[in-house]
Regions:
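Glycine-rich phosphate-binding active-site loops on the catalytic face of alpha/beta enzymes
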Residues: 86, 90-96, 129-139, 173-193
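Short hydrophobic/aromatic-enriched beta-strand-loop microsegments
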Residues: 63-67, 85-91, 106-110, 127-132, ...
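Histidine/lysine/aspartate-rich catalytic loop segments that bind and position anionic ligands
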Residues: 93-127, 131-136
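A charged, well-structured terminal subsegment
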Residues: 142-149
Length: 205
């Protein structure tokens, strides 16, 4: 599936941010999330199994599987080789951004201040992850930050909850939010995951 970053961000109001240790859990979790209405799945490269988890999740019809916590071009290449359909980074560097742009993959780098955004704009990027959202000042900070950059849109991630997500999604510059609350740690409770996904999919303001 070939999508641009805008389409990835608009596919659902919440992108589950997934930290999965056991590849055996990957496909069932992906099925529950997609069934609940959250097709865009960000698998963070924070576990040794992450690349295998992505490969397993891609078996699920309708799943749009990407890699998060991508820090450098080597990790980008590994994620692409595993079939990542989009790439999310916690920050913005010229080296990683240029490699991602050259690959053609939808790319969502992290920003936390105006200088980050301006570096992104210099590279032709206008879609960003606002991270860490709550630690960086929350919604008031993003509103102030977004004001000079009307062409930019954001996916706030970090400390956002099911309760606070609607307020973020009501802000025009926010296309979606990243959420780790949808899938808990440990052995998955698939019914609970699908229920949480349904609730998250209904959050679009």
């Amino acid at each position: 599936m070939s999508m641009n970053v805008e389409a990835v961000m608009r596919a659902a109001p919440v992108i589950p941010v997934l930290v999965i240790d056991d590849p055996a859990h990957a496909e069932p979790i992906a099925r529950a999330l997609v069934a609940g209405g959250l097709p865009v799945l960000e698998v963070t490269l924070r576990t040794a199994a992450a690349l295998e988890v992505m490969t397993e999740m891609k078996r699920v019809p309708g799943a749009i599987v990407g890699a998060g916590t991508v820090l450098d071009p080597a990790q980008l290449d590994a994620a692409l080789a595993a079939g990542a359909e989009f790439i999310v980074a916690p920050g913005l560097t010229e080296r990683l951004s240029q490699a991602a742009i050259a690959s053609g993959v939808p790319f969502l780098p992290g920003i936390a201040n105006a200088s980050d955004i301006m570096r992104g704009l210099d590279l032709g990027l206008t879609r960003f992850k606002f991270f860490p959202a709550m630690a960086s000042g929350g919604l008031p900070a993003l509103k102030a930050l977004a004001a000079p950059f009307g062409q930019c849109r954001f996916c706030p991630t970090g400390g956002i909850t099911e309760a606070s997500a609607p307020e973020w999604l009501a802000f025009d510059a926010v296309l979606c939010v990243g959420g780790s609350w949808v899938v808990g740690k440990g052995a998955p409770d698939l019914a609970a995951i699908e229920k949480a996904a349904c609730a998250a999919a209904a959050l679009r303001a």
